[in-house]
Amino acid sequence: MELIAAVYDDWGIGANGTQPVALSADRKFFRQTTKGATVIVGRRTVADFPGQKPLPGRVNILLSQSLRELPGFTVCSDVQQALELTKAADSVFVIGGGSVYRQLLPHCSGAYITKVHAPVTSDTFLPDLDADPNWKLTATLETGEENGIAYEICRYQRK
């Protein structure tokens, strides 16, 4: 299981339930990386999806204690249920939001992090993998600039 996220300089991932700065390069990387995989997502993140519809070309698992069903999603009420469902999957990505990242990070062996260097005030955060002794930056896959905003797409592995 791996995590995929875009973070700002303070490792923030969002504000008021949305991603304040979204880069097309990050979205493209996300689509290419998760296509054909199983993705685990939280209810608040799904609320930000267009039409609250599942991501096409993926098996969509919704981790929610309040929702029991949502068309196109397999709904799990707890982490253990989601872990059981993904045991046989070839590729599993945790795609957010903050609560889902925190609950599933201990089960992840790797992470793809797009570092977006934009002046953003976040209210939701991902743990700082650079400061975590259990994680190691193993590669910078891409660097660039979009609309004056610098970014890097990085690969982390659990030690």
Q: What do the PLM-derived regions correspond to, one by one?
A:
Residues 1-159:
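Enzymes that bind and transform nitrogen-containing heteroaromatic metabolites
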